[in-house]
């Protein structure tokens, strides 16, 4: 039971940090490459 409580208290913190970092990364990519439907370094 103690392990379950530890997991339930750690998982929301880790997911909040992960989604916050992911949102920040997406915001910075959209700031550097505005309205980019296809990135120039991925098109061959």
Curated annotation (Swiss-Prot):
An example Gene Ontology CC term for this record: photosystem I
SUPFAM superfamilies documented for this protein: Subunit IX of photosystem I reaction centre, PsaJ
Example GO BP: photosynthesis
Keywords recorded for this protein, A-Z: Chloroplast, Membrane, Photosynthesis, Photosystem I, Plastid, Thylakoid, Transmembrane, Transmembrane helix
Compartments it resides in: Plastid, Chloroplast thylakoid membrane
InterPro entries: PSI_PsaJ, PSI_PsaJ_sf
UniProt main location, coarse: plastid
A Pfam match: PSI_PsaJ
Family membership: Belongs to the PsaJ family.
Name of the protein in question: Photosystem I reaction center subunit IX
Species classification: Eukaryota, Viridiplantae, Streptophyta, Embryophyta, Tracheophyta
